[in-house]
């Protein structure tokens, strides 16, 4: 079977709470770093989440 193009990434909260989401993205079509506004349950607000590598 062929390997998939999608890679696992981690979206880390910019609020500094340590909260993160995991998702996948296609590095071939979207080589730039992902930034999304998502809900951070620790501070109970919508904040910017930035892409980081999964260790």
Curated annotation (Swiss-Prot):
Keyword Ribonucleoprotein (UniProt): yes
GO terms for cellular component: cytosolic large ribosomal subunit
Pfam families for the chain: Ribosomal_L33 (PF00471)
UniProt similarity note: Belongs to the bacterial ribosomal protein bL33 family.
Key words of the record: Ribonucleoprotein, Ribosomal protein
Annotated protein name in UniProt: Large ribosomal subunit protein bL33
InterPro entries named in the record: Ribosomal_bL33, Ribosomal_bL33_CS, Ribosomal_bL33_sf, Ribosomal_zn-bd
Gene Ontology molecular-function annotations: structural constituent of ribosome
Any one Gene Ontology BP term: translation
Stored PROSITE patterns: RIBOSOMAL_L33
Organism ancestry: Bacteria, Pseudomonadati, Pseudomonadota, Gammaproteobacteria, Enterobacterales
Species the sequence originates in: Sodalis glossinidius (strain morsitans)
């Amino acid at each position: 079977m062929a390997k998939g193009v999608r890679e696992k990434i981690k979206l880390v909260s910019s609020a500094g709470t340590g909260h993160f989401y995991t998702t996948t993205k296609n590095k071939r079509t979207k080589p730039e770093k992902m930034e999304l506004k998502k809900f951070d349950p620790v501070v109970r607000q919508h904040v910017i989440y930035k892409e980081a590598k999964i260790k």
